[in-house]
Amino acid sequence: MKKRLHLIIADSELELVPESIIDHPAIVNYAKRRKKKPEKIILDSTYHHAALRQLEDGERRGRPDIVHICLLNALDSILNKEDRLRVYVHTRNDEVIYVDPSTRLPRNYNRFIGLMESLFEKKVVPEDLQLLRLEKKTLAELINEISPDAVFIMHENGEFMIPKHFGKLLASFKKPVVIVGGFPHGDFRSKVEGVKISLYREPLMAWTIVNEVIVSYEWEVIK
């Protein structure tokens, strides 16, 4: 069996506008400009920061940009081109996006948002190819489905390990899962068992961690 890295962007702050703030002026005006129903748009702190103050955890929510950048980097990696990577997005509301390795995401952020809105509505996009598929599922359920032989959680308080050594560790398993938080700060909301790893003495952005993990694994499995 070919070794593959299974990368999960977990507890991602990617969600439709919650019902509790649908009538907020910041949401209503934004929806009107885009000619969409408020309940059909993706929550985005860039445009909805005033409404976010009314939400629990509002300071960390509405960050689809994190998912966008992480996916662009992962899907364009050599590891993915060599069919050695599988990527999943798990959201704060326990939805899982299955990402086909051949998916070519829009580089343009606004087009990416439109794509995510279509995905949340239709559950699969495009409907004929199903490159992206959305299912209701917890992080624990996703990990159980993958059935890995090791689970690593990237965490600022984890065991320190330089990327090169972490790559060697990952490559010693056939089906490792690496979990990266898809949120700007704070801790994971989901409870999951695994070995916590830190790659640097300071906190790093999610997409930086994704890059470091992928490249460290590439060095070990692609010759």
From Swiss-Prot:
It is an enzyme of class 2 (transferase). Keywords: Methyltransferase, Ribosome biogenesis, RNA-binding, rRNA processing, rRNA-binding, S-adenosyl-L-methionine, Transferase. InterPro entries: Alpha/beta_knot_MTases, Rbsml_bgen_MeTrfase_EMG1/NEP1, Ribosome_NEP1_arc, tRNA_m1G_MTases_N. GO terms for biological process: rRNA base methylation. It comes from the Archaea. Pfam families: EMG1. Its EC number is 2.1.1.-. The record marks R63, R104, R107, R111 as: Interaction with substrate rRNA. One of its GO terms (molecular function) is rRNA (pseudouridine) methyltransferase activity. It catalyses: a pseudouridine in rRNA + S-adenosyl-L-methionine = an N(1)-methylpseudouridine in rRNA + S-adenosyl-L-homocysteine + H(+). The record marks D65 as: Stabilizes Arg-63. S-adenosyl-L-methionine binds at G181, G186, L199, Y200, R201, E202, P203, L204. Homodimer. Methyltransferase involved in ribosomal biogenesis. Specifically catalyzes the N1-methylation of the pseudouridine corresponding to position 914 in M.jannaschii 16S rRNA. Belongs to the class IV-like SAM-binding methyltransferase superfamily. RNA methyltransferase NEP1 family. This is Ribosomal RNA small subunit methyltransferase Nep1.
